Regions:
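Sec-dependent signal peptide recognition
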Residues: 1-7
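N-terminal signal peptide c-region/cleavage motif recognized by signal peptidases
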Residues: 11-14
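Cysteine-dependent hydrolase recognition
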Residues: 18-366
Length: 366
C-alpha cells in the first residue's frame, strides 16, 4: 500500500507537459562539436531557433570563476532578457565544448569550486536581483518535491542538463535514444556491503518504491554485470572494492538512466585510452584526468540515455537519491525533473547529462 501511494503521488504531478519552447540550448562558437550538437538537438526536438544561445568562450573543461561570470553567465542572462525568455524557459541545455567546471580557491564543503551547469541553475534568481552565496552548496528548492510540478514562480531556478559524451556520435545516439524512451525494463540496484549504510538504505528504499517485478537488487559482495533490458541503474560505481572492470556489459534500453555514488565520475568528457581501467587511489600512476574512478561518459558510450556525475567531491549527502530519481521518472516526469527532484543542492558539483525532455512513453507491446 505504501509503495502504491507514493507512486500515485508521483503520477499525480507527472502530467504537466513541458515543451521544446521552454528549453534554452547553449552552444559554443569556439567548439565545432558544440555547434554540431546544438544544431542537431534544436532540429531533432523542434526547439525554436530563438531559443538557441551562442557563447564565445574557451572550450577547455576547467575555467576560472571570472571566465564563468563574464563569458557564460552574463551572456546567457543578457540573451534571456533580450529574447523575453527569462520566465518562459524552464530548462537550460549546455553542450559538449561548453566549459564543464569552475576551479576553486577553497576546498571541502566550503569550496567555491562548482560545476558550470549547477551554477547556471541559480541564474534565474540572479537575474531577479538575488545573490546566492559563492561558497558551499545552496539548497535546491525542488529537492524531494514529488507532489508538485516544476513551475514558476514556485521554483525560482532553471533545470540545467548537458548534452555531452566522448564525441558527436555518442551525443547524437543519446539524443535519438531519448526520443524512443519506453516504460519497460528493469531497475538494477547494486549495493556495496562495505560502504556507508546511508547510500545502501537509499537503494533499498528505491527498491521498495518501484514495481517489485521490475527490480534487481543485489546485496552480495559481487558486482552486477551482464543484465539485459536495463532502464535504471544505481550503484557505488568504482567505490565498490569488488568492481574491477570499467564496463559492466549491461544491456541498456532507450531512456535508461544511471546514477552512482562516485566523487569524480563527471570530471571529464575526454575519452581515455581503451587500455585504461578504473583503479585505486594509491595507484596514482594510472589515474585518468586526475582520478582513478569510473566515468559518467562510459555509461553513455555504452548505451545509457541519461546519467548524473560530479566534477569535484560532492560528499555522499549531496549525491542524487535513487529513491526519488527512479520513482519520479517511472511516473512520467521528464529526465531533468527526475534528476533535480533527487539532488539536494545547487551551485555544487553535480551534473546531469541527457535530454531534459526525455520522458518514458507507454509500452505499446504490453
Amino acid at each position: 500500500m505504501h509503495r502504491l501511494a507514493l507512486l500515485l503521488a508521483f503520477v499525480a504531478t507527472a502530467s504537466s507537459a513541458q515543451s521544446p519552447a521552454e528549453v534554452l540550448v547553449v552552444g559554443n562558437r569556439s567548439s565545432a562539436v558544440s555547434e554540431q550538437i546544438a544544431r542537431y538537438y534544436v532540429q531533432r526536438r523542434s526547439v525554436p531557433q530563438r531559443n538557441l544561445c551562442w557563447l564565445e568562450v574557451t572550450p577547455e573543461e576547467t575555467i576560472a570563476r571570472n571566465v564563468y561570470e563574464e563569458k557564460i553567465a552574463a551572456p546567457i542572462a543578457a540573451f534571456l532578457k533580450a529574447q523575453g525568455l527569462v520566465d518562459r524557459i524552464l530548462y537550460i541545455v549546455t553542450t559538449l565544448g561548453v566549459p564543464l567546471r569552475i576551479a576553486g580557491s577553497y576546498w571541502g564543503r566550503d569550496t567555491d569550486a562548482a560545476a558550470v551547469d549547477s551554477e547556471l541553475t541559480l541564474l534565474y534568481e540572479i537575474i531577479h536581483g538575488n545573490k546566492p552565496p559563492l561558497r558551499g552548496p545552496s539548497r535546491n528548492p525542488f529537492f524531494m518535491r514529488r507532489d508538485e510540478p516544476f513551475r514558476r514562480p514556485r521554483f525560482p531556478m532553471y533545470l540545467v542538463t548537458r548534452l555531452a559524451g566522448y564525441d558527436f556520435a555518442d551525443v547524437k545516439a543519446m539524443i535519438d535514444r531519448s526520443m524512443a524512451a519506453v516504460n519497460r525494463g528493469k531497475f538494477v540496484l547494486d549495493l556495496n556491503s562495505s560502504a556507508d549504510r546511508t547510500g545502501n538504505d537509499w537503494l533499498r528504499t528505491a527498491a521498495l518504491l518501484l514495481p517489485k517485478d521490475r527490480v534487481v537488487i543485489d546485496e552480495t559482495t559481487g558486482v552486477v554485470c551482464g543484465q539485459r533490458e536495463v532502464i535504471g541503474y544505481a550503484s557505488w560505481g568504482s567505490n565498490d572494492p569488488n568492481r574491477k572492470g570499467r564496463f559492466l556489459g549491461l544491456g541498456w534500453l532507450p531512456g535508461a538512466l544511471v546514477t552512482e555514488f562516485v566523487s569524480s565520475n563527471g570530471r571529464t568528457f575526454v575519452r581515455p585510452p581503451d587500455s585504461w581501467n578504473i583503479t585505486t587511489w594509491k595507484d596514482t600512476a594510472n589515474f585518468f584526468a586526475g582520478s582513478p574512478q569510473s566515468l559518467t561518459a562510459d555509461y553513455l558510450h555504452e548505451g545509457a540515455t541519461g546519467a548524473s556525475g560530479h566534477v569535484y567531491e560532492p560528499y555522499l549527502a549531496f549525491t542524487p537519491r535513487p529513491d526519488y530519481l527512479f520513482p519520479a521518472y517511472l511516473s512520467g516526469r521528464t529526465l531533468a525533473e527526475s534528476y533535480y527532484l533527487s539532488i539536494p543542492a545547487l551551485s555544487w558539483q553535480n551534473i546531469v547529462v541527457g535530454d531534459p525532455l526525455c520522458r518514458l512513453k507507454k509500452d505499446r507491446g504490453t
